[in-house]
Every structure is written in C-alpha cells, then in structure tokens.
Design a protein with these regions (language model features):
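Aromatic-lined carbohydrate-recognition surfaces of secreted/lumenal glycan-active proteins
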Residues: 422-429, 434, 500-508, 538-587, ...
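Catalytic domains of carbohydrate-active enzymes, especially glycoside hydrolases
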Residues: 352-380, 493-497, 599, 657
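Substrate-binding cleft of secreted/luminal carbohydrate-active enzymes
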Residues: 236, 596, 600-784
Length: 791
C-alpha cells in the first residue's frame, strides 16, 4: 500500500519520563534519532510521519494518542477505537504487534497508538497501513515548550468571580498562579494539581494547598488545567509567567538532568535516614541503584552535545535507578493490610492468574473483589435462581476457569491463596444497576422491590434522577431477606475473609429527590404511625418529617445489624468493613459502631495532611478498637509511581493498612515501585489474623534486635538479650491467654523506657519499638472485642 501522508499539526507534547526508555532492558541498544522534530511524532518504516496529539488521554476522537505503561495495564478507551500495539525494540523504535478496537493491553516499556471511533482521514489512513512486524520510530523533541494563559494571578473573590465559591478562589478548569503575597499556602482543595516553582524551576509536583515558596510561586490547575500541568511538568521543568499571565513550561535535557539529580538527592537522604534511624531496609540494593544512577547521569553529560536524544534517555534511566534506590531505602512492615479493590473482568483462568500475579508483585495481601455488581453475582448463585433471576453475571456465565468450572469467585479465592492473597467480598449492596444497562434483573420479576423517589409518580422502577443508578428498597422486609440470603450463600460457600459493604443506605438527597416512597414502605410506615409519608414536607411538618427520615435510617441500620449477626454466627472472625464517602455517609458511620469491625475512610487527596485529616475525622466517630485502614485513589487518578508510593506511606500512618482503588487502573511502574519499596516483604493482615499478626511483629522485633540494633550499636548487647527474652515470653503468652496481655505489654514498654533513660537504647529505636508494641496491643484488643464468641 502506498504511504503518501502529510503530517497534521498539534501542540501537545509527551508526558514525562516514560516514552523512550524507562525500564529499558540492558539488551536494547541506544539509537539516536536522525530527524529533528518540534513535537512528538510517529514515523513509519517508509518514512512517513504523523504528529501525536496527546499522551495517556482517554479523549481520543479526532487525534492520535500515545499510551505508555505509566498510564495503566490497559488503555481504558472505548470499544470502537482504533489502536495499534507496539513492542519496544530499541531506544525509540517499536515493532507493530497487532491491532485492536479499544481498551488494549499496554506492553511493558511499549506503546499503544490510539484514535477514537470519530477520527480524521489522515490518522485513519496512517493507522490502517501499518503492518504487523513493521518498525516505527517515536521522534521526540529535545526541547518541549507549552504555554497557557492563567485565569488569574493571586485571585480574590472580586478579581476571579468564577473561583469565588471555591477553596483558594480557584474555579472549575482554571489555571491560577499564586505568589507569596497571596499567603503561606494556595488554600486549594485536593481536587486539582499544582507545581511549585523556585528560581524558575519546578521543585515539587502534585497535591493541593501547596506551600508558596519565598523564592517563587505555585501554578495550580483544576480539571482541564490540571491535566495540562500533569502532561507538561516534571521536576526540573523551567517555568516563566509573563506580565499577561501567560505560563510557559519548558522541558529539555537539563530539565531531566535536574530531575535525576533531585531524585538522587532524595534517595541519598532517605538512605542516610535509614542508617541514622537504624531502619530495616534493603541497603545493598539501594547502594547499587544509586551507583548505577550516578553512572548514567555522567554518561548523559558526556553525550549531551553530540547525541541529545541519547542523553535524554540516559537521564531518564538515571532517574529510574534513583527512584529504585529510594524505594529500597524504605522499611517494609511485617504486618499491615495491603488491599486492592477490583472489579473482575476475566473470562479465563489465565486471565485470573495474570491479575493475581501482578497483585502479588506489588505486595498486596488482600483483594476486595467486587462479587456483586449491576444486580448480578460473579459466581453461580442458587439464591438468585430461587428468586427468578439469572444465576450469574452474563459476562462470566460462559467463562472457562479450568478446574473451577464457571465459578470466577472460586478461582480468585483459591488462586489468590496460592499467592498469599486473601479475598474479601466487596459488594454494591442495594445499588443494583444503572440506566445505561436497562432494567436490573431483580426488577423484572420483582418490580415492587424498587426503591422509589418522592418525585416518581409512576411507582415503577426508575433510575435515580441524579446518579442514574437503580436501587433496591432497603426498608422492605422481603428485600432484606433476599439480600441476607445472598451474603449468607457467599460466606458459606467460599473461603472469603470478610464483607466490604457499600451502598447500604438510600441515596442522600434533598426533599423532592428523597427515597422511601414505594407503595410497600409507605403502607408499612402508615400502619405504624397513621401517616402516609408522601404527605409530609420538611417546610410545613419539620418534626414529622424528621421522624420519617429517622425511621428510614433505623431500617437501614437494622439491616446492617442483621447482616453482622448472621456473619458472626457463621464465623466470628469474619470481618465486616464499611467504606464511607466524605459527606453524610461518613457522619452516619457511627450508627454501625456495634456492627462494623473495620472502617476504610476514602481519602481523595494526595498529600499527607489531607489524607490524615480524612482518617482522623472518621476516627472521632467510632469507638477505640475499631480496625482502621485508609482508602486511597492513587491508581484511579493515574498518579505516577512515586506518587503511589508517597500516598501509601501517608495513608498507612496512624492506621493498620491501606486499601487502594482500583487495580483496573494500576500501572506496571507503580506495581514495581510498591514491590521494591514499602511492600517489599510479605505482611500478615491484622484485621483478618490479629493474633498471628501480633506474634509476627514480636518475632520481627526480636530479629531486628540481633541483626540491626545490637549489631549497629543502638542497643546494649546484654540488655538486648534480656529484651528478646521478654518478647519471647509475651509471644508465647499471647497464644495461650490473650485476654490478660495488657500488663505484659505495659511491662515491656516500661522496660524500654528504662533502657532509654539509662542510655542503653537509642531514643529513636526505643520509640519505634514502643509504637510497634502499642499497635500490636491494639490488635489483640481488636481480636477480643471483634473475634471473640462472647461479642
């Protein structure tokens, strides 16, 4: 086929760090591109070019998008897209593997070329004529410049009315510049992206409410502007803002070199901290990675003038090696939850194994597997069939899961166990469908089970006017009976460790959109009170309206109590967790204080303060002894690998672990980073096995006393031996008689205090051991309060 195509224009450049050689294996030789370009460009084997219109962008209509493996394992694009999968063969060369119609797998270190169902003739023709096995070349500009005019500089409500109602006076899709005269911080919320600029160079990325440096400023974006910043900013980018508010971001070889230097400094600082604080880390691996990084950076400097593209490649590799050194310098806990939410899609056993292998590589120890969604179960359900509904989600009815038959849940439970991953059932509760999928299966035979909004005069099942979701009517006794049967079936037939309940209340709406107005629920309330709730109005009947909404809330709480009692009657160790979203649902979590074992508050932000604020606000609502994990959205928001690691470290602080949302958006680099860093070693899950987790931590402290603290002079040898004996006695006692462990824990803590007072134990080590013991003591208390037959 003739290849006579012209280049189309675009102003979108490549995103940072990943396009040419990140993670490149040593067998790939570096090649310098001979063609100079101003924008990111794909060149086919015949020499024809096509300019790339964006990187890692889901909006792919009428433009050519390049996806790399920093985005996810899949492109997540819509079916009907036209995509070409490219496998890496050299520094900037790729081999055409095959073509797909959307949501393509992204090869590790490879690319996917993508355009939407609606596209230009030029892009369509270029992709059509690419042949399997053909070599294509990615041409990158050595210097990348992007420019965008800010909506406001140092805004006020008066100067930026569009941003007046919002934190930091930053409105939707706006780009704002903040100078020190604005204040100490930008005062923005977590729903955006910010770059900190010092002396004209980007020194910090991400987050909200950033501190404004005295020697620079912060550029902050929301929505479209946030995407512009993330696509064009790296540590080391050069930034200028002119008198008209035009923000210019420049990336060049020096920018990437600066990024590498900063990464090396960060890693060295972390390594020094590990040494000074006697932390248990992979120091030898960290040292090797730092040496490799510095060698690559020197090579980049050598060829910077003669081969700038090769220099760019070396600096990227140097940055990656420095990142690895940082990850290796982080401690890895012996006991904590490392959980991942996941909606399964696999129709083969090989697909299940691939997902679980990747989860294991990251270091996860628990899968919160979505076992019910869109009104179906993922496993063959006799309860569903009994009530006249399909026995399994149609996607999995013809699945082939080897010895597990068509049972996807069984495959996940058993294959997960082989890899050290337990399964907790994540359920969509009373949300049973969405409008785009049509009437949910439950309402085809049981239309009277539908939850009805006040403004629904038809009485027929209709989706929520806001979310477009369909809801079962939680206040109806028959509906509760059905749902309890589903959860009982799941718990009895599968070795799941717990149930993560979601959507266990009516949607929270104002008067006209409020729920609870089905014929059956209205009749039930009228029978008990003599009042038809549809006649009530909070404006004219405030007390009666409050009585009505309280009655509905009691019905919701009664169901959760029944579910708790049913689960604990089957298995006292079975874990009930809730995941409240910020807002009314988070506040109401205290209603379930006697029925919930663990709470996973959802922290949408990506900085330590916002994550911790979410956790601490939730803890105020629940009794001491409740198991707490932190839910974070690092994968879902497509943070880079370092962002994922930072989020995990922030989220673990003050809790017993982390839940990440969601593995469908995970990326290979982030999985690799977690597996090298904070989740390098296997960890016991304290919510599922609190006593075993406690014993594991005690044994680990014993090992660290011998291998690190005494060896490196942080603890007197004789006193170290005595402390180990105390820990051994405690370990044995916990196994035999956990009910009376407070005294033993406190005795060892006092022993540690005495050692610190006598300068026979370094303060930093003693405080860390005390913190570990306090956490472990809490796990024992959790076991007694939540897993004991008397509770």
């Amino acid at each position: 086929m003739s290849k006579k195509l012209r280049v189309i224009s675009s102003s979108i450049f490549a995103s940072s760090l990943a396009l040419s050689s990140l993670g490149m294996v040593s067998s790939v030789t570096a090649q310098d591109q001979s063609t100079s370009v101003d924008v990111l460009t794909i060149k086919d084997q015949s020499g024809d070019h096509m300019i790339v219109g964006g990187t890692n962008q889901l909006a792919n209509d009428n433009k050519l998008i390049v996806f790399n493996d920093t985005f996810s394992y899949y492109t997540e694009t819509k079916k009907g897209s036209k995509e070409i999968i490219l496998e890496k063969t050299g520094l900037n060369t790729y081999r055409v593997k095959n073509k797909t119609d959307g949501d393509s797998p992204i090869p590790q270190n490879g690319l996917v070329l993508s355009t939407g169902a609606k596209t230009t003739a030029e892009i369509d023709s270029f992709l059509i004529q690419l042949e399997s096995g053909e070599t294509v070349t990615l041409l990158e500009p050595v210097v990348k410049e992007e420019e965008k005019v800010a909506n406001a500089i140092d805004p006020t409500a008066a100067t930026n009315p569009a941003g007046a109602p919002f934190d930091g006076f930053r409105g939707p899709d706006q780009l704002i510049v903040y100078h020190p005269s604005f204040g100490e911080t930008t005062k923005t919320n977590a729903f955006g992206y910010e770059i900190t600029v010092e002396n004209g160079v980007v020194t910090k990325l991400g987050g909200g409410g950033s501190r404004i440096p005295a020697n620079g400023y912060v550029v902050s974006g929301h929505g479209i502007a946030a995407k512009w910043l993330t696509s064009n900013s790296i540590i080391g980018s050069k930034v200028t803002v002119d008198e008209n508010g035009s923000v210019k971001i420049i990336q060049d070889v020096d920018s990437y070199a600066y990024q590498s230097e900063q990464a090396i400094q960060q890693a060295k600082a972390s390594m020094e901290k590990a040494k000074t604080n006697y932390l248990d880390v992979a120091m030898n691996k960290a040292k090797k990675s730092i040496a490799k990084s510095e060698k690559l950076l020197n090579e980049a400097e050598t060829v910077k003038e003669s081969a700038p593209v090769k220099a760019l490649d070396f600096t990227r590799q140097a940055t990656q090696s420095a990142y690895d050194a940082y990850y290796y310098s982080l401690p890895s806990n012996a006991a904590e939850q490392r959980a991942i939410w996941y909606r399964p899609e696999e129709t083969t056993l090989e697909g299940v194994k691939q997902i679980l292998d990747r989860m294991e590589e990251a270091g996860f120890n628990s899968v919160y597997l979505e076992t019910t969604f869109h009104g179906y179960t993922i496993y063959p359900s006799k309860v569903m069939e009994k009530y006249g509904m399909p026995g399994q989600h149609p996607r999995f009815q013809n699945g082939e899961y080897g010895g597990y038959g068509k049972d996807l849940l069984a495959a996940y439970v058993q294959e997960g166990r082989k890899r050290g991953l337990t399964v907790q059932a994540w359920t969509d509760g009373f949300m049973v469908g969405e409008s785009s999928l049509g009437i949910p299966p439950a309402f085809k035979n049981h239309p009277d089970w539908a939850a009805i909004q006040r403004q629904n005069n038809t009485g027929e099942p209709l989706p929520d006017t806001s979310s477009k979701y369909y809801w079962l009517d939680i206040a109806q006794p028959e509906v509760q009976k059905f749902m309890l049967a589903i959860y009982k079936e799941m718990q009895l037939n599968y070795e799941i460790k717990g149930l993560n309940i979601d959507y266990m209340r009516y949607p929270h709406h104002d008067f006209e959109k409020s729920y609870g107005f089905s014929t059956k629920v209205r009749a039930l309330y009228k029978e008990q009170t003599g009042i038809d709730p549809v006649t009530l109005n909070p404006a004219t009947n405030p007390e009666q309206w409050e009585d009505w909404t309280t009655w509905l809330r009691i019905k919701e709480n009664e169901f959760v109590a029944k579910l708790h009692d049913q689960a604990k009657d089957i298995n006292q160790k079975f874990m009930m967790t809730a995941t409240p979203e910020p807002g009314p649902e988070a506040v109401l979590i205290s209603d379930w204080k006697d029925d919930i074992d663990g709470v996973i508050p959802q922290a949408y932000g990506h900085d330590f303060n916002s994550i911790q604020r979410t956790v601490q606000d939730s803890k105020k609502l629940m009794p001491a002894g409740t198991m707490y994990y932190t839910g974070i959205y690092s994968f879902y928001h497509h943070l880079d690998e370092m962002g994922n690691v930072d989020d995990v470290l922030s989220a673990k602080h003050g809790t017993s672990g982390v839940n990440m949302f969601a593995f469908g958006q995970a990326s290979a680099p982030s999985v690799d980073a977690l597996g090298k860093g904070p989740w390098r070693e296997k960890a016991l899950n304290p919510g599922e096995e609190p006593i075993l987790a406690t014993q594991t931590v005690l044994t680990e402290i014993e090992r660290q006393i011998s291998d690190i603290y005494v060896e490196q002079g942080a603890l007197d040898k004789k006193e170290g031996k005595a402390l180990k004996q105390s820990l051994k006695r405690l370990n044995k006692a916990i196994h035999k008689n956990p009910e009376h462990m407070d005294k033993e824990f406190n005795s060892i803590i006092k022993q540690i205090d005495n050692l610190m007072d006598k300068n026979k134990l370094k303060q930093i080590v003693g405080e860390r051991i005390k913190e570990q013991l306090e956490e472990a003591k809490g796990w024992v208390e959790y076991s007694l309060n939540h897993q004991s037959p008397s509770n």
